[in-house]
Amino acid sequence: MLPSTIVEILCSKTAQADVHVGGWIRTRRNAKGFVFLELNDGSCLKNIQCIINEGSAAWDMLDGVNTGACVSVYGKLVPSPGRGQDWEIQVEKMVVHGLAAPEVFPLQKKRHSDEFLRTIAHLRVRTNKYGAIFRIRAEAAQAIHNYFYKKGFYYIHTPILTGSDCEGAGEMFRVTTAHSSNDSQSSDNFFGKECSLTVSGQLEAECLAMGLGKVYTFGPTFRAENSNTPRHAAEFWMVEPEMAFADLQDNMNLAEELTCEVIRKVLQCHIDDIMLLDKYVQPGLIKALENIIAKPFIRCSYHDAITILLSSHKDFEFPVTFGLDLQSEHEKYLTEEYFKHPVIIFDYPKEIKAFYMRQNDDEETVAAMDLLVPRIGELIGGSQREERLDNLLSRIRELGQSIEEYWWYLDLRRFGTVPHAGFGLGFERLVMLLTGVSNIRDVLPFPRTPGYLEF
């Protein structure tokens, strides 16, 4: 039988004569005639105190049991006289699954730097900070699925291997075939064309939206950008909804509503974890998250955003001009100094956006939108898609891209075209927003970045 989780045990209303809990030892304290073990199983931030009395069957199993060891304990759940805890376990029996020699176990009872913990990513989840981060990550993912399910979206799966470049940026990982482990020769003959890891599931999601109405994909994406920044990783997760019969306003509404729903859910279900991060990682985190959901997001056209930036007379590293793609410093000024709130920028110049975005009537801008949030910058990027065949063909030619490569995408406009819209949400950036963490490497269980491919 599976053990009870500590979060379940701590929610008990009454004492129990027979409990079974498994976990990893955080601390061991010896006293005359008994031993205190602080046990954590990852189900919550809190530990459960386990008391082993001399003479019990469990006492004989204590040899070598220290911080890092994994055990199962069996005994009685009783009220605790200690401060800050309602319950403790009087242990009658203990099974030792694995020891951790203190002279080599890297996680001792002290603060470790994030840089050090990245080198032991396989163990860092056992710390309070990273346990909290990855519980919040899991809750955020579940909240996203629940939100879309309630909204009538279908969860779909799009290819990881692709022959097309959704973004047209060319920063893709090539996939080739090696005929044996010792073969230095590679081949593109498997598919008969070049194959890459996907940068986005958007184009395929559009196809399914044209028959299912509202869909979303939630999966890994890959960018071969040689960017060693706290905001970029080579492998990350994207949430990409697509909606038939939707325009730019619908898209902006969905982006705002989804973001707020996830924040509310995490604040509701993981307040202990958030409080820890508020104290040790990002002071003021709880207040910042509450402020985000307290009032509607600002909406500002690209033209107005550039005007605001020009009027600031700030000495930006990247000078502000119309036609500029907003940089991190511009996003930071808009969200943290000017609006002091999330802002959705819309109607961008077509020259700085992708081919599939719908051209506005002014023929100079497209119906694109970016959701910018304080401390993170761009969280979501999306658009109303170009549903008019002639306009889409013209734009593809204008950018010098291959019409033949997108024959299937163009078919959506030939056969029953419909206005539709969607966006991509960078899931790791959302987790950074929720946790106060400043480096994307610390919200990915096993980060993939330039020059680093451990685990």
UniProtKB/Swiss-Prot annotation:
Statement: the UniProt record of this protein carries the keyword Cytoplasm: yes
Catalytic activity of the protein: tRNA(Asn) + L-asparagine + ATP = L-asparaginyl-tRNA(Asn) + AMP + diphosphate + H(+)
Presence of keyword Nucleotide-binding: yes
GO cellular component: cytoplasm
GO molecular function: asparagine-tRNA ligase activity; ATP binding; nucleic acid binding
GO biological process: asparaginyl-tRNA aminoacylation
NCBIfam families per UniProt: asnS, PRK03932.1
Top-rank EC class of the record's enzyme: ligase
Entry's family note: Belongs to the class-II aminoacyl-tRNA synthetase family.
Matching CDD domains: AsxRS_core (cd00776), EcAsnRS_like_N (cd04318)
Subcellular location: Cytoplasm
Keywords: Aminoacyl-tRNA synthetase, ATP-binding, Cytoplasm, Ligase, Nucleotide-binding, Protein biosynthesis
Quaternary structure note: Homodimer.
Domain of life: Bacteria
Taxonomic source organism: Lawsonia intracellularis (strain PHE/MN1-00)
Any Pfam family: tRNA-synt_2
E.C. number: 6.1.1.22
Protein name per Swiss-Prot or TrEMBL: Asparagine--tRNA ligase
